[in-house]
Regions:
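Short linear Ser/Thr-Pro motifs
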Residues: 74, 108-109, 122, 192, ...
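Conserved alpha-helical substructure of the radical SAM core
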Residues: 123-153
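P-loop NTP-binding catalytic core
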Residues: 88-97, 101-102
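Conserved AdoMet/S-adenosylmethionine-binding subsite of the radical SAM
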Residues: 144-153, 158-316, 320-323
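Auxiliary Fe-S-binding modules of radical SAM enzymes
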Residues: 1-92, 244-253, 258-346
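Generic beta-strand structural signal
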Residues: 80, 92, 103-107, 115, ...
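Canonical Radical SAM [4Fe-4S] cluster-binding loop centered on the CxxxCxxC motif
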Residues: 98-135
Length: 346
């Protein structure tokens, strides 16, 4: 980065910056609104800002964002998968999903990932770098700029572990919900983690209305260690205690994501174990038919197995849904599109 990342500044920092270059503090709100309400790409678009100030901003700062390089649109439901290029040439993925209740965007928080989950393509090449708040924001802003649709929900479930980029994710949340910016409702945002226990507890301390999702994927530690290396650091018991603390602090339910892998974690006994684990906890289970990955020998559970698993959880009074498969005709596991693009352009 050769210039200051102006899009990642909060309003107070922006006002202080403008004072430091001899401008009035009130200009901060104007600049902030141009960036976070108008989604501009360049300072010359700021029509109510003097040319002199625009030149100062151009000299000292940069509006970092994303550039669309490829996209796939589902003919079935309009789901759109994007590959975005960053300022340094790295590629990330984002998905726009259209529902009756509004438009939802799944964004990435890192370039690559170091968590090593066995069923995820995003982690095959490890972690390259964290995304800046500006780069997370612009995945959403780019959708609104190019499609004209209004995004009402955001899930941080794309490439990367959000709590491994904790400070930048917190700044993203501050900016995306700011009343002088997009002003997105906290309740319309979900952060998904594979289970970084200290961060879950820190997040609980914020007493935010942002939703928390846990990538669980196994009902016991032995199985989870096979699927997710993070389980060697934090046990399911530790995760559950952190989740209960989050629920106590926020009075909000936790979503547990459970990817069903054929003959691995989709049997009746696994559903019973999961039911016991979550009994009495304010939570919701999201069953995910796993996407096959060429490099991993995992297959998707049958529809009957998925339904049986759901039925057993419901019988045990666990709130559960099966994730709707969006854009089946352009389906690819998280990280697969980016991986194929890199292979074709290397």
């Amino acid at each position: 980065m050769d210039k200051t990342d102006i899009k990642s500044m909060n309003l107070e920092e922006l006002e202080e910056f403008l004072l430091s270059i001899g401008e009035k503090a009130f200009r901060g709100k104007q600049v902030f609104q141009w960036i976070h309400q108008k989604y501009i790409n360049g300072f010359d678009e700021m029509t109510n800002i003097s040319k002199d100030l625009r030149q100062k901003l151009e000299a000292d700062t940069r509006i970092y964002g994303v550039k669309e390089v490829e996209k796939w649109v589902s003919a079935i439901d309009g789901t759109t998968k994007y590959l975005f290029e960053l300022y340094d040439g790295h590629i990330i993925e984002s998905v726009l999903m259209k529902y009756k209740h509004g438009n939802s965007v799944c964004i990435s928080s890192q370039v690559g990932c170091r968590m090593g989950c066995r069923f995820c393509a995003s982690t095959l090449d490890g972690l390259t770098r964290n995304l800046m708040p500006s780069e997370m924001l612009d995945q959403i802003y780019a959708f609104e700029r190019t499609t004209g649709v209004r995004v009402s929900n955001v899930v941080i479930m794309g490439t990367g572990e959000p709590f491994d980029n904790y400070e930048n994710v917190l700044r993203f949340l501050e900016l995306i919900t700011h009343k002088e910016g997009k002003n997105l409702s906290q309740r319309g945002i979900t952060v998904s983690t594979c289970g970084l226990v200290p961060r879950i507890r820190e997040f609980a301390e914020l007493e935010t209305a942002v939703n928390l999702a846990i990538s669980l994927h196994a009902p016991n530690d032995d199985m989870r260690k096979e699927l997710m290396p993070i389980a060697n650091r934090y046990s399911i018991e530790q995760i559950m205690e952190a989740c209960k603390y989050y629920i106590m602090k926020t009075n909000r339910r936790v979503t547990f994501e459970y990817s069903l892998v054929a003959n691995v974690n989709d049997k009746k006994e696994h559903a019973q174990m999961l039911s016991g684990l979550l009994s009495g906890v304010l939570c919701h289970v999201n069953l995910i038919p796993v996407n096959p990955i060429e490099e991993r020998n995992y297959r998707q559970s049958t529809q009957q197995s998925i339904q049986n698993f759901k039925n057993l959880l419901e019988k045990n009074r666990i709130n559960v849904t099966i994730r709707r498969e969006m854009g089946r005709d352009i389906q690819a596991a998280c990280g697969q599109l980016r991986k194929k693009y890199k292979a074709n352009h290397s």
